[in-house]
C-alpha cells in the first residue's frame, strides 16, 4: 500500500504558478483524504520559468525521490515538452541507475521520455495519469473511471486489469475558479475497437505519447532532442521491442493526420512494427481525427496480421486508466479486457 507520495515537475513547472494554486489545493486535499503523506520535491513548485531554466534541478528532484527510502510513489505533476533535457544529468555518470529503487512511478504525455529513461535502467512504471491533470480535476470529484484506477494503484501497488469506460468527456474549456465543482457532461463511449488482426494477444506494454516519440526523430520542436536521444540510446532497439505491445496515444496538440502519419512512418523505420506483438492506440482528445487515425494505423503499419486495437481510455482524452509498463499483459478485444500478470 502506498503511504508517502513525492510530486515532481520533470517537464512543465505550471504547478508553481500563483494562478493555479486553487487547483493544486484541490489535488492536495484529495490525496490527503486517501491518508497519503504528500511531499513536493524541492523544485517542483518553483514555477514555469525556473523549472524550464533548470533541467539539472528537475533531475536532482527525481534522483532524491528515488533515494529516499520513505517515498513509495513518485507522481509527476504534469507533462510538458522538454524533459529530454534531463538526460545528461541522469546518465552521464550512471546517476539514475545508481539511484533507482523499486517505487511506483506514474505520469504520462511528455513523461513518456521519463518512462523510457526508467525502462533503460530496468524499472517497471505506470502510464496514464498525473497530479495536475487528474487529481486536481475541477469537478466535484475525480472522474469515476480515473479515480477507480488511481485508488487501485495506491491500495495495491499495481493494476490487475483494464476495461473500457462507459463514457468520455470533452476537454474542459475553462480552468478558472468559477469552474470548481462543475461536472463535465458525459458522452457514451463504445469500448475497445479491434481494427485488424487476432483479438487476443500478449506482451509487455511500452510506449506512450506519439508526439513525444515523434520528437525523438524530428528536431522541429527542439533541434538537440534527436541528438541527445541518439547519444543516450533512449529509444529501445528492435530486439528490445521483440514481443512487446506498443502503446500510442496522441497529445492535446491534436496532431493533424499528416503529422500522425509522419510519426508512424518514423516509428516504422525503426523496425518496431516488425517486432511487436500488437499495437494499442488511445482515444484522441475530443475524438479529433479519430477516423483518420484509425485509417492511418492500418495503412502505414501495413501488417495485416498485426493486432491493432483503438479507442483505449489512455492518454489525453478523459477519463484515463493507468497502464502498467513492463508487466506481462493479455489483451482480449472480444471480451473487452486487458489482464496483467505479476
PLM feature spans:
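Long, hydrophobic/aromatic-enriched structural stretches that serve as scaffold segments
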Residues: 67-91
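Charged helix-capping and loop-helix junction motifs
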Residues: 21-24, 55-59, 92, 260-266, ...
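ATP/nucleoside-binding phosphotransfer catalytic cores, i.e., glycine-rich phosphate-binding loops
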Residues: 259, 265-268, 278-342
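ATP/NTP phosphate-donor binding region
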Residues: 1-70
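Structural motif
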Residues: 73-75, 106, 245-249, 280
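Short, acidic/small-residue loops that bind anionic groups at enzyme active sites
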Residues: 92-120, 124-132, 307-308
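Conserved anion/nucleotide-ligand pocket segment
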Residues: 126-211
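Oxyanion-binding "anion nests"
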Residues: 205-251, 255-257
